[in-house]
């Protein structure tokens, strides 16, 4: 297998991913703002009622379906987590997490950036009904963070952008582990055994080099159902499925055919407009090049725009809407303070301190081209929690403790906004200072 070719192709995927995520972050922000406006307007009752509307189909007295809110949080977000899983697998095999030397610094940073916010929140809410929300400020929203850092353009070193992306990927992996370990209740082992059986079949398909995505996706639906029924959040099934999707390029004669088509195209006469023959050759090249993509690349290319421009903005619109009126109790335990301090203070301090200590003890080394001041700036941007923080708040606060969920959402919005503004201004002024010195 030509690993160099695969690595180059996956590098191109990363560039496309950055582009879609950065613009997707802006769209995500607009939907969050729209949700807050609608939730505090004259149509707020219709807004909140909409998400409880059941969608599905009925067979006799048996209804198969969910509320619209559950369709978004359990089904559509599973596709988002599938893309995250594909991204993590790609980085582990070919990217910045593919070796200890590459991975150690951002992974250690992600660990510090999760532990510190979690401890701050837990310390403030210990021995209260809200202490279970410690996972809320531990997450980083890669779309928002990338959106901010891309707006800064050339003022930010490329190495810092790569560091932030890799940190966010490692952070996503950590958030998935937190969800699986701490936000799982009433496990049903019969369904877990069923899920394990599906995973074994998926592993067998991978082992047999099955490159068609259809059997993986069909079994993925079955895996989602088993995991959903087991008591573990169904989005974990999507991550497991992602790790079963093959990364190997299909072995056939299409690469030889591509060379022949390229040679034919080069031999055709140069025209201002493409001839019919040239158009047919280019069409054939496109088809054969697409066929040479690995299943992982195909699925990631398909999911990236859907996730960035539909699923995440819809999730934001459905979950960011909080009615800020006299009835909301902002003093529910210390949820507001715990989340805001966790995101705005815990994230940058945790990331900076653990990496600084790690380098001093020669456990890891800082990437070339970025200073400790840059690391601190990236830490502030990592405090933009939003999507994953909102998702965890939905899992942490249910039933009688829904007041805490509303407060947590306000805190996530405020904390993410403060972190984004501080991070952007800090990196902007840091670049300006460096320019003046020159």
Curated annotation (Swiss-Prot):
Task: Say if the entry is tagged with keyword Plastid.
Answer: no
Q: Is-annotated flag, keyword Membrane?
A: yes
So what does this thing catalyse?
Na(+)(in) + 2 H(+)(out) = Na(+)(out) + 2 H(+)(in)
* InterPro entries tied to this protein: Na/H_antiporter_dom_sf, NhaA
Where does this protein reside within or beyond the cell?
Answer: Cell inner membrane
Where do the TM regions start and end?
Answer: 23-43, 62-82, 104-124, 133-153, 162-182, 185-205, 212-232, 302-322, 337-357, 372-392, 410-430
Which keywords describe this protein according to UniProt? Antiport, Cell inner membrane, Cell membrane, Ion transport, Membrane, Sodium, Sodium transport, Transmembrane, Transmembrane helix, Transport
Where is it found, in Gene Ontology cellular component terms? plasma membrane
Name a GO molecular-function annotation. Answer: sodium:proton antiporter activity
Q: Which Gene3D superfamilies match?
A: Na+/H+ antiporter like domain
BP terms from Gene Ontology: regulation of pH
Q: Name one Pfam family in it.
A: Na_H_antiport_1
Membrane topology type: Multi-pass membrane protein
The stretch of residues making up the signal peptide is none
User: What function does the entry list?
Assistant: Na(+)/H(+) antiporter that extrudes sodium in exchange for external protons.
NCBIfam families the record matches: NhaA, PRK14856.1
Q: Which family does it belong to?
A: Belongs to the NhaA Na(+)/H(+) (TC 2.A.33) antiporter family.
Q: Tell me the protein's name.
A: Na(+)/H(+) antiporter NhaA
* Organism for this UniProt entry: Helicobacter acinonychis (strain Sheeba)
Its gene is nhaA
